[in-house]
Amino acid sequence: MEAIAKYDFKATADDELSFKRGDVLKVLNEECDQNWYKAELNGKDGFIPKNYIEMKPHPWFFGKIPRAKAEEMLGKQRHDGAFLIRESESAPGDFSLSVKFGNDVQHFKVLRDGAGKYFLWVVKFNSLNELVDYHRSTSVSRNQQIFLRDIEQVPQVHGGDRATSLPQQPTFVQALFDFDPQEDGELGFRRGDFIQVVDNSDPNWWKGTCLGQTGMFPRNYVTPVNRNM
C-alpha cells in the first residue's frame, strides 16, 4: 500500500526513515508495531510513525465485496489478468485474489505463514503490495500463464462521447480521502466533502459533482451516505 505524509518526520534512530510532508511512501509492513509501519522512500527503508501518514488505497483493493460481485465486475473486463483483491468471505481476516482468464474468473486464496508473510505458492512477501507487483511478471497460476494487470478504468472523455447512467434519485457519497486531479476531466475534493453521483456505471471511476465542479473520481475514495439535499 502507499501512504501520503501529513507532516515532516526526521529520523532519530538508525532504523527510522525521514520524510517530508506530501511525500508518497510505500508501506512494506503494517504489522511490525502498533504505532510504527515499515516503509520505503527513494530506495531507502525504515520505520515511520503511523500517525504521520494517511493511507492511500490501491485501485485493486475492494475490501468486503462478495465473490459473485467480483466475478461480475471482472467478467466485464477485456483482458486476461485483470484482477482485484478482496477480503475473504469464508475466512474473515484473510484475503482472496480474483483474476479474469478467458471467459472465467479464477480465485486464489492469499496464504500467510507464522511470521505474517503473504504468499500464493512458494515465494513470500511482506505485504500484499509486494505480492501484486511480483505477480505482474510471474504467473499467479501453475497451469496457465496469467499475469496480473490493473482493471481498466473509464477513459477521460467530454460531452456526449460517453452516455452516462443516471441514478433515478440523487445519490450522495462522502470523501474518505483528499483527491487531487491528475488529468483533465477528473474531480478534485477534500476529505469530508459530499459529492453527488451522476454516473456509477463503472466499478472503478464514478462521475459526480462537488462545489459546482463535475468530473470523474475513484470510487474507493468515497463512502455512501444517507443525506437528503
Swiss-Prot record:
UniProt keyword terms in alphabetical order: Cytoplasm, Developmental protein, Endosome, Golgi apparatus, Meiosis, Nucleus, Repeat, SH2 domain, SH3 domain
Molecular function as annotated in GO: epidermal growth factor receptor binding; insulin receptor substrate binding; phosphotyrosine residue binding
SUPFAM superfamilies, alphabetized: SH2 domain, SH3-domain
GO cellular component terms given for this protein: COP9 signalosome; cytoplasm; endosome; Golgi apparatus; nucleoplasm; nucleus; plasma membrane
Domain SH3: 1-58, 168-227
Claim: Repeat is one of the keywords in the record: yes
The UniProt record lists the keyword Cytoplasm: yes
GO biological process per UniProt: female meiotic nuclear division; insulin receptor signaling pathway; regulation of MAPK cascade; signal transduction
One Pfam family in the UniProt entry: SH3_1
Subcellular location: Nucleus; Cytoplasm; Endosome; Golgi apparatus
Superkingdom, natural source: Eukaryota
SH2 domain sequence ranges: 60-152
Domain commentary: The two SH3 domains and the SH2 domain are necessary for the reinitiation of oocyte meiosis.
Function: Adapter protein that provides a critical link between cell surface growth factor receptors and the Ras signaling pathway. Promotes meiotic reinitiation during oocyte maturation.
Protein name: Growth factor receptor-bound protein 2-B
Source organism of the structure: Xenopus laevis (African clawed frog)
Gene: grb2-b
